[in-house]
Amino acid sequence: MGAKQSGPAAANGRTRAYSGSDLPSSSSGGANGTAGGGGGARAAAAGRFPAQVPSAHQPSASGGAAAAAAAPAAPAAPRSRSLGGAVGSVASGARAAQSPFSIPNSSSGPYGSQDSVHSSPEDGGGGRDRPVGGSPGGPRLVIGSLPAHLSPHMFGGFKCPVCSKFVSSDEMDLHLVMCLTKPRITYNEDVLSKDAGECAICLEELQQGDTIARLPCLCIYHKGCIDEWFEVNRSCPEHPSD
């Protein structure tokens, strides 16, 4: 009997220590007090040993942990929106700063943008005839447009392609007419009887037995050399002024 009576007392002692709200009321009967004491003991044991709680309640705890982990991520959207607004304001400020320095349209000038695109330093702006400085006048002479011997106004003269002489621009027309209409020099064909030095055209030795051409100025050359020379020139290689 003593052991049976000590059981509820010990349970009531534990109930008072851990959970006072689970004690039965003073107006309850003895049987109800005993049942209440047993329920309080079970509640105290459940609070003291949480590992004995059924597994059906565990998903709710994990769901609560997931909700708690997801809760701090909510303010990220306003922060991203605030960053986007800052970037947009910076970009609009940059556009506003660049607006006073807009480049004018190159096609609004006297010469369109097509000329500037297709022009180069060599052709002098597309090779078009434009007045110098925008003033009315004749076509502009571009450097490199003509060979050196055909640009008399730039070099003060030209080299005659016939006689290889430099002639002033004032005498250019007359000199060309004279060179082109001048009769071809005739020569006497002969056989060299002895060595006579070197040929001024091919720079080879004139040896005995070679067929030579003797010009009116008494200059002698290889016949083949002087024939090739006369195909381009109409004067003696050593006396171009004659």
Swiss-Prot record:
Any idea what this protein is called? E3 ubiquitin-protein ligase ZNRF2
Function, please? Answer: E3 ubiquitin-protein ligase that plays a role in the establishment and maintenance of neuronal transmission and plasticity. Ubiquitinates the Na(+)/K(+) ATPase alpha-1 subunit/ATP1A1 and thereby influences its endocytosis and/or degradation. Acts also as a positive regulator of mTORC1 activation by amino acids, which functions upstream of the V-ATPase and of Rag-GTPases. In turn, phosphorylation by mTOR leads to its inhibition via targeting to the cytosol allowing a self-regulating feedback mechanism.
Spell out the Pfam families in the cross-references.
Answer: zf-RING_2 (PF13639)
Pathway assigned in UniProt: Protein modification; protein ubiquitination
User: Keyword Zinc-finger: yes or no?
Assistant: yes
Q: What class of enzyme is it?
A: transferase
Top-level lineage group: Eukaryota
**Where is region (Disordered) located?**
1-141
Q: Give the taxonomic lineage as stored in the record.
A: Eukaryota, Metazoa, Chordata, Craniata, Vertebrata
